C-alpha cells in the first residue's frame, strides 16, 4: 500500500489514513480501516476513478497483495459534521457507533457539550460524523474522541464524564440515542496530508 500511495498515481488521491483497531465490541471482524477525507466531494469521487483506471491495474504487485491479504468487511460513506482535520493525527481514538433518532436535537446537545470539552486544559478533541450509506447495521452517526495517547485519553475521559456539561448531554440525548459499538484504535499512517 505504501508503494502505491508514494507513486505518482497515489499522490493524486485525497488525504487518507490507515487506522488500526485495538479493542472493539463490533460484530464484524475488521482489524483496520482505510479512511479517505476531503472537503471537496468531487475529489473524493475522483478516488474511485483512480482505482478503476488502467494505471492502477498496472501496479499489479500492489493490487495482488491487496487481493491476497485483505478481506473487505464493511464500507461506508460518511460526512464530518463537527471535526477538525488538524486533530486527525492524535495517536489514540475511541469511536462510538451510535443510532440517533433525533439528529437535530443531538447536534444541538453535542455542540453545547463540545464547547465545554474544548475549554478544558487537556489535549484532545471530540468529533461528530454522520454515516450516509453503508456501515454497520443501525449506526447513523459516529462520535470520535481523540487524544495524544491512551493514558491521556483515559485521564481526560475520567475527568470530563464527571462534568456538568457531560452529564447534561448524556441526560438530554439518552431518550433518542443508543450506543451500538465502541472501538479504540490508532492511526498507523497518513498519506497526502499537508
Regions flagged by a language model, labelled:
Residues 1-194:
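Short S/T/G/P-rich N-terminal loop/turn motif that feeds into the first structured element of a domain
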